[in-house]
UniProtKB/Swiss-Prot annotation:
<comment type="function">
    <text>Has a dual role in the assembly of mitochondrial ATPase. Acts as a protease that removes N-terminal residues of mitochondrial ATPase CF(0) subunit 6 at the intermembrane space side. Also involved in the correct assembly of the membrane-embedded ATPase CF(0) particle, probably mediating association of subunit 6 with the subunit 9 ring.</text>
</comment>
<feature type="active site">
    <location>
        <position position="174"/>
    </location>
</feature>
<protein>
    <recommendedName>
        <fullName>Mitochondrial inner membrane protease ATP23</fullName>
        <ecNumber>3.4.24.-</ecNumber>
    </recommendedName>
</protein>
<comment type="similarity">
    <text>Belongs to the peptidase M76 family.</text>
</comment>
<dbReference type="GO" id="GO:0004222">
    <property type="term" value="F:metalloendopeptidase activity"/>
</dbReference>
<dbReference type="Pfam" id="PF09768">
    <property type="entry name" value="Peptidase_M76"/>
</dbReference>
<feature type="compositionally biased region" description="Pro residues">
    <location>
        <begin position="28"/>
        <end position="39"/>
    </location>
</feature>
<keyword id="KW-0999">Mitochondrion inner membrane</keyword>
<keyword id="KW-0645">Protease</keyword>
<keyword id="KW-0472">Membrane</keyword>
<feature type="region of interest" description="Disordered">
    <location>
        <begin position="1"/>
        <end position="46"/>
    </location>
</feature>
<dbReference type="InterPro" id="IPR019165">
    <property type="entry name" value="Peptidase_M76_ATP23"/>
</dbReference>
<keyword id="KW-0479">Metal-binding</keyword>
<feature type="binding site">
    <location>
        <position position="173"/>
    </location>
    <ligand>
        <name>a divalent metal cation</name>
    </ligand>
</feature>
<keyword id="KW-0378">Hydrolase</keyword>
<dbReference type="GO" id="GO:0034982">
    <property type="term" value="P:mitochondrial protein processing"/>
</dbReference>
<keyword id="KW-0482">Metalloprotease</keyword>
Length: 276
């Protein structure tokens, strides 16, 4: 399968939107001398988890419903079902992607703004794929809904998309990253300074619609009425920064997000307001 071409780079060299919060503090967080160890992931052991992939799926489903499978086993079961339904999930994702490019006001607006910076986002570099999830030794489940790469474009994790609205939020999030990449010289690697990553994650969570009140209440069960939007954006930005290789821990991620919060949360570009 051919690798999708990257979005074309823009010649714009304006600096990213963090002058007030980032430049006022000359103290840069020093990069860790050694990278934190990579998490170890668990393979399924039927004797430990209760999930046996050699039997019919509905028998495992019954065992899950009757509490005979551990939480880890449920995740391994889910992953195997994703593998079995990969073709169906990717076909549905591609159909929804085509619909959103044709009819979604948010997606069409962002695509036009990316094109204005000499970039291209279409079906050749916005791809739907199955994204494997893994269970770490500490019980954490590592999964993602999508991703952006300056070299390859946008990845949509077809197996994680609940519906077209969820895909719209995910695609808008990654398109904000693409716009930031073309508009500014974003340091995606971290390079000891995670402020670029923190800023673009704040903006993507804020502008994509993934933190709107209806999404938080109906999907995530968060019925908080005060500061719900700000808390959601901050939490998701911290989680994304924590996934960067140069981030030491949650304290480090929180510190970096707080340093750029005021300037990046107030920057609505390329929109005029938060519409979703």
């Amino acid at each position: 399968m051919a690798t999708p071409p990257p979005p074309q780079l823009s010649s714009t060299s304006t600096q990213p939107p963090s002058p007030s919060s980032a430049s006022s503090n000359p103290q840069q967080p020093s990069p860790p001398k050694t990278q934190p160890p990579l998490p170890r992931f668990l393979d399924n052991d039927p004797a430990r988890t209760g999930y046996d992939p050699t039997v019919k799926w509905w028998l495992n489903y019954f065992r899950i419903m009757t509490g005979q499978v551990t939480r880890e086993g449920v995740e391994h079961y889910r992953e195997d079902r994703y593998k079995a339904n990969e073709a169906r999930d990717c076909a549905r994702c591609e159909a929804d992607r085509a619909y959103l490019f044709a009819y979604s006001p948010t997606i069409r607006f962002l695509r036009d703004k990316v094109a204005a910076l000499n970039g291209t986002l279409d079906e050749t570099n916005v791809v739907c794929r199955r994204c494997p999830a893994r269970v770490a030794e500490d019980g954490r489940v590592v999964r993602q809904g999508g991703g952006f790469s300056p070299e390859h474009g946008i990845l949509i994790c077809a197996n994680e998309m609940r519906d077209r609205s969820h895909l719209e939020d995910t695609l808008a999030h990654e398109m904000v990253h693409a716009w930031d990449h073309l508009r500014w010289k974003v340091d995606w690697s971290g390079g000891g300074n995670l402020r670029h990553a923190a800023c673009t994650e704040i903006r993507a969570s804020m502008l994509s619609g993934e933190c709107r009140w209806t999404r938080e209440t109906m999907t995530r069960g968060n019925w908080t009425l005060t500061q719900q939007f700000q808390n959601c954006v901050r939490m998701r930005a911290i989680q994304s920064v924590m996934a960067r290789p140069t981030c030491r821990d949650d304290v480090h991620a929180t510190k970096v997000v707080n340093e750029v919060w005021d300037s990046c949360f107030s920057d609505k570009r390329p929109f005029e307001e938060v519409y979703r």
